[in-house]
């Protein structure tokens, strides 16, 4: 009887995990080790960019760069919950380019998708999605334009 209960519990946990949202796997974030310190934004420049965001207790949660070392990003979050506001700040080496969107979003992930392009994955809750498991998903590619400004190559999803 005991093994049957254990099996039933494992099946229930597995079904719950399968039904709790989906996030496609992406490549590992790029490393800043391939680029020199002059290719990345300084701590002071990052702090100034964070200071320009809406008032919150922002803290860095991730950073990366494209293989050509020009486009850098810093992801900041305003909390520890899975649905806390987040923002992506872009930099052309040590020059701030601004955030990916005017307003913070939740459930953001950034990956490098080409030599000079970063892809931001946005997720959002739909219907009765629990906070842990958003099912809405969209991606936007960003790169530094010829004018030196950040530009999106795809429409930004509007949840």
What do these predicted ranges mean?
Residues 75-86, 91-95, 123-126:
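Short, flexible beta-strand-to-coil junctions
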Residues 92-153:
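Extracytosolic low-complexity repeat regions of secreted or lipid-anchored proteins
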Residues 13, 28, 125-126:
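Residue-level signal for mature regions of secreted extracellular proteins and peptides
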Residues 26-83, 157-159:
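Extracytoplasmic low-complexity, Pro/Thr/Ser/Ala/Gly-rich segments
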Residues 1-10:
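Bacterial N-terminal signal peptides that target proteins for export
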Residues 21-23:
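Bacterial signal peptide processing site
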Residues 16-19:
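C-terminal motif of bacterial Sec signal peptides marking the signal peptidase cleavage site
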